[in-house]
Amino acid sequence: MAKRIITISREFGSGGRFIGEEVAKKLGIAYYDKNIISEIAEKSGLSPEYIQENAELSPKKGLLAYALAGRDITGKSVEDMVYEAQRKVILDLAEKGPCVIIGRNTDYILKDRDDVLNVFIHGDMPEKTQRIIRLYNVDEKEAVKMMADTDKRHMTNYNFYTDQKWGKASNYTLCLNSSQLGYDRCEKIIVECSK
């Protein structure tokens, strides 16, 4: 069966976002990443700026802070409301047509669909570090810190909301090392596997 929806989860610095965008161009399908923030904000009633800062990375302050966080009348925290709005937007996008969606626990949210190709992009530390240094104009120490912090927040969010382990191979159809394969080959593999 052809896979009309491609989800891409990735380690920070692995080039997963770039690879996803190129795959969407090659297939001539929609690409969703940060461009869905306004839809999530609208569904949650929160500002796009708040969503930008928190949607994929909450509960960023840890489980104790999450447990002590304020809740609405239904018992949902702000993080839960953001996640629920994000889930609804992703389900709507999947119904609209073929697309590539980056991050946001999309592999888990769409797990019951047969037409989804779930991809995890990872890379080797030296290559990821150099990419972050180039893209963000930071030194090596800051690049390593950014990588560790971002991946930890992605992992915490994913593990919390999915009850699964972020980056675990069995959660994905494909796991690709962009450092060893290169971006172009990763793109070609994903395109081929989507057919």
Segments from the language model and where they lie:
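RNA pseudouridine synthases
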Residues: 93, 106-112
